[in-house]
């Protein structure tokens, strides 16, 4: 008789424990129910990147002196710099400059150490391609300025909470994530 009573007691304790766990998880779920979603509808809404965002590299051909500092500071020796020495003026003439963004780790060392500031990071992060060879950008493709997300009227931009806080001077909680 006692084993049967202890079995019922154990069953009752396990039932109470299971009900408590279900109640706790239900409370957590219900506490998240009144919040706004934090996901964005990607092609139609885009997040404005921060000032220090490291996107695609922009290259200005006219400023480059072919010093190859960018190649030396790159952890994977990625930029390909082709140049020719002009003997009459004793200077290097840049022939070709290319970066393969399929291999680039976007560390920003090339931009930081460039003595003539011919390299800069843009806010462009959409570098998808069907063929990996399309990610090898030459000086013409690197020289194109990306279209700004802010200027595109077809896309609704969503600012970060820190950017909105700085602009408006008031603090937002997790329920207010958009600027409309």
From Swiss-Prot:
[4Fe-4S] cluster 2 binds at residues 74, 104, 107, 110. Its cofactor is [4Fe-4S] cluster. It is found in: Plastid, Chloroplast thylakoid membrane. One of its GO terms (molecular function) is iron ion binding. Its EC number is 7.1.1.-. Residues 55-84, 95-124 form the 4Fe-4S ferredoxin-type domain. It is a peripheral membrane protein. Binds 2 [4Fe-4S] clusters per subunit. Keywords: 4Fe-4S, Chloroplast, Iron, Iron-sulfur, Membrane, Metal-binding, NAD, NADP, Plastid, Plastoquinone, Quinone, Repeat, Thylakoid, Translocase. Transmembrane segments: none annotated. [4Fe-4S] cluster 1 binds at residues 64, 67, 70, 114. It catalyses: a plastoquinone + NADH + (n+1) H(+)(in) = a plastoquinol + NAD(+) + n H(+)(out); a plastoquinone + NADPH + (n+1) H(+)(in) = a plastoquinol + NADP(+) + n H(+)(out). InterPro entries: 4Fe4S_Fe-S-bd, 4Fe4S_Fe_S_CS, NADH_quinone_OxRdtase_chainI, NDHI. It comes from the Eukaryota. The keyword Plastid applies. GO terms for biological process: photosynthesis, light reaction. GO terms for cellular component: chloroplast thylakoid membrane. HAMAP family: NDH1_NuoI. Belongs to the complex I 23 kDa subunit family. NDH shuttles electrons from NAD(P)H:plastoquinone, via FMN and iron-sulfur (Fe-S) centers, to quinones in the photosynthetic chain and possibly in a chloroplast respiratory chain. The immediate electron acceptor for the enzyme in this species is believed to be plastoquinone. Couples the redox reaction to proton translocation, and thus conserves the redox energy in a proton gradient. This is NAD(P)H-quinone oxidoreductase subunit I, chloroplastic.
């Amino acid at each position: 008789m006692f084993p049967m009573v202890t079995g019922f007691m154990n069953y009752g304790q396990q039932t109470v424990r299971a009900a408590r766990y279900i109640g706790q998880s239900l409370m957590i779920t219900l506490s998240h129910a009144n919040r706004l979603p934090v996901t964005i509808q990607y092609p139609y809404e885009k997040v404005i990147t921060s000032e220090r965002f490291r996107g695609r590299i922009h290259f200005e051909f006219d400023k480059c002196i072919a010093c190859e500092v960018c190649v030396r500071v790159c952890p994977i020796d990625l930029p390909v710099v082709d140049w020719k020495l002009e003997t009459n003026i004793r200077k290097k003439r840049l022939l070709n400059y290319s970066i393969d963004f399929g291999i680039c780790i976007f560390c920003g060392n090339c931009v930081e150490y460039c003595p003539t500031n011919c390299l800069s990071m843009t806010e462009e992060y959409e570098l998808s391609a069907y063929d990996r060879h399309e990610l090898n950008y030459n000086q013409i493709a690197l020289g194109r300025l990306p279209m700004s997300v802010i200027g595109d009227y077809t896309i609704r931009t969503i600012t970060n909470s820190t950017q909105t806080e700085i602009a408006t001077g008031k603090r937002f909680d997790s329920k207010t994530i958009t600027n409309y």
